[in-house]
Regions:
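C-terminal motif of bacterial Sec signal peptides marking the signal peptidase cleavage site
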Residues: 15-18
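Cystatin/cathelin-like cysteine-protease inhibitor module
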Residues: 20-141
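Structured alpha-helical
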Residues: 12
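Bacterial N-terminal signal peptides that target proteins for export
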Residues: 1-8
Length: 141
């Protein structure tokens, strides 16, 4: 019986020692993983066109389409490649809805998320250098 009580502190020390070890990746490892996903999206226009074909209610006859080349921008805890977009698309009834803006956020050179909330887009796209995007204006269903 006395030996059983002597073994309890030893077992308890092993259990507590297991709690003090770090189970997940370190902060530096997480940052390295995040940075490794920053690959320039060579096909950003094709990705945007494929996405907008389904995102827009009426992708035909878009006017005033402009896009910025992807640039590293602060998103969340680090930087991501972001391409900014301006366009005037039609609604289901064929009426133009007015100029809209969006930001395409890329992870590992692929479109990960499209931000369309004005406050977020304004923050992500401040200082973006836009150029004409005739491929979007020529888009069909």
């Amino acid at each position: 019986m006395r030996q059983a009580f002597a073994a309890v502190p030893l077992a308890l020390s092993f259990v507590l020692a297991g709690c003090s070890t770090e189970l997940g990746p370190s902060r530096a490892e997480l940052q390295a993983q995040w940075d490794a996903q920053n690959v320039y999206p060579q096909n950003y226009k094709a990705d945007l066109l494929a996405f907008l074909r389904t995102y827009l209610n009426n992708p035909q006859g878009v006017r005033g389409a402009m896009v910025s080349p992807p640039a590293l921008t602060t998103v969340g805890q680090g930087q991501r490649y972001v391409a900014c977009l301006r366009y005037n698309a039609r609604d289901i009834d064929g009426k133009y809805m007015g100029q809209k803006e969006g930001a395409a956020i890329y992870v590992s050179a692929r479109l990960d998320r499209f931000a369309d909330q004005p406050h977020e887009v304004k923050q992500l796209c401040s200082g973006a250098a836009y150029a004409a995007f005739p491929e979007l204006e020529a888009l069909r269903r």
